[in-house]
Amino acid sequence: MNILITGAGLIGAHTARQAVDGGSKVVLFDLAPNREYLEKVVGKGRADVVAADMRDLPALISALDRFQVDTLVHTAGLIGKRVAENSYTGATNNILGTINALEAARLRKLRRVVYVSTFGVYDRAKISGSAVREGDAVGGHNLYTVTKLCSEHLVHSYTEQYGLDTIIIRPAGVFGRGHYVGGSTVGMIMRDLALAVVKGDPFTIDAKVYAPNEVVYAKDVASAINLACQVKNPKQRTYNAGSGVVTGPQDLARIVKELAPNIDVKVTGASAEDSVKSSPLDLSVSKAELGYAPRYALKEALRDYMEELWADQRN
């Protein structure tokens, strides 16, 4: 496959790495690509990079033509609180960017578009099951999730109206080796924690910030996306991508102590041992139809993440 990935951040870079490893040709399309970061994650010269704005439809179409792209993965956009910090910029980046991705794919008759949404679109107040399924209730509760849900509707509309082959991936809270520029609370907490362990520094987990949550390693999300690019004749168009496990701050502290017994890790602001826990994502359909199964439990993910950070420190 010839794949164009919009967004060269945490998810985009790891998706590119795995796609290249699998034999695909990859181009990353990003407004301000961090080339040093991409060299570390993807590898030097292993993927082409185009510095351009998702809101520039002609630039996107030009990139599709130049690199003879047949598959588009759309990860670009502002995340989390960054959308609310400038609502106009956030909305135009996230919604217009999705429209441009879909329109470019339609005009160039691409074989598939994979849109990366978020598990934040689920309306937890209306879900009572032990695990969250793809068909459960959705609803936007902040500007970020509204833009993602709006984008999902656009994706479905292009499939229904134009026959565009699309798949939506809804990942849990993603963490891993990334150049965080703000917005991802989970990602930044995990980064700060991993860096503290690597440096041998004490670390405090604020339970009011890191509430019970499902987190998933970027390498697992990248696997789900690449599987979505490859699957033939999918039975549905939306798939969860998580770890299938909800962890609280005390769980996180315990795992860190197992990995690094000499590190001082404290939890503050904890309620009655995280008594209110959200349900994990149901991964049964993703496994059955995509072949997705997370390879990294949280402990293994943190170990792998720290090993990469240690390697960066040595270099």
Tell me what each language-model feature is.
Residues 201, 205-315:
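C-terminal substrate-binding subdomain of Rossmann-fold SDR/epimerase-dehydratase oxidoreductases
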Residues 74, 99-143:
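Conserved Rossmann-fold NAD(P)-dependent oxidoreductase catalytic core, especially the SDR/UDP-sugar
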Residues 3-7:
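Conserved N-terminal Rossmann-fold NAD(P)-binding element of oxidoreductases
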Residues 54-93:
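NAD(P)H-binding glycine-rich loop region in Rossmannoid oxidoreductase-like domains
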Residues 156-212, 218-222, 255-257:
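NAD(P)-dependent short-chain dehydrogenase/reductase
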Residues 43-56:
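Rossmann-fold cofactor-recognition segment
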Residues 143, 147-150:
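Active-site helix of classical SDR
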Residues 12-13:
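N-terminal Rossmann-fold NAD(P) dinucleotide-binding loop
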